[in-house]
Amino acid sequence: MKEKIRLSGVPETMLQTIYARAKESRGRGEIHDAKAEEIIEKLDYDFSLADKDTAMRSGVIARTIVLDRMTKEWLASHPGAVVVNIACGLDTRCYRMSGYAHWYNLDLPETMAVREKLLPESGTISQIAMSAMEDWGSKISEQNVPVLIVIEGLTMYLNAKDVQQIFAVISNRFPKATVFVETMNPMIVKRFKEKSIEGSHAKFTWGVKNGVALAALLPDFRFVEEHSLCEGMAVFAPV
């Protein structure tokens, strides 16, 4: 029996992204996400808009390629680290990575209720059902270990104040954490439209020019480097 999921707004976008990863896994295979394929088979959901939205799908695959590579490289040089995946949705990166001591997936309670049904997790993978703007750090038991925070597919649905609050929560609990955060250029926020995202009644609301501009908003953080989704596109759809 298939699961019927009722979500709207930003939480619903997680269904579009996992569909994109599942479809790519069955196609050219620049990524292979067995968990995504498994989850899609369990869902009773109309993916027709996501199926037609090639722009959304290409973006999801490109960022998956880039963030998978970055996370894998970081974990290789920080064995035994803790990873916190903020706004995880139905992300399955924790199943594609190794070398971490504990992986925490964090999202809003309604989202985590769906994740718990489809991806019940235990052992070195834990669920945190909280807003990224709350003190979720109190749920992390490990101390004095390297910490990586991944924020994917979230900031473009917020505003500058919300983003600053999320980073304040991080710096309060984990002052030495490394953060990988996906952002969107303001011009793209203003002009770009994704059919499947609009179909879920979510809307892009915020962007920042580059990593230096983001760091200027975050006094406790230092900008290190930035990567473009074009790096993922070069693998996914080489010219």
Give the role of each language-model region.
Residues 1-84, 88-130, 142-144:
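Rossmann-like AdoMet
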Residues 83, 103, 179-181, 223:
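Hydrophobic/aromatic residues located in beta-strands of well-ordered beta-sheets
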Residues 127, 135-138, 157-175:
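A short, conserved alpha-helix within the catalytic core of class I
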Residues 144-156:
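Short SAM/SAH-binding signature in class I
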Residues 148, 170-186:
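Conserved beta-strand signature within the Rossmann-like core of class I S-adenosyl-L-methionine
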Residues 186-202:
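Short, glycine-/aromatic-enriched active-site segment of Class I SAM-dependent methyltransferases
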Residues 201-231:
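Short alpha-helix
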Residues 234-239:
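A C-terminal cap/extension of S-adenosyl-L-methionine-dependent methyltransferases
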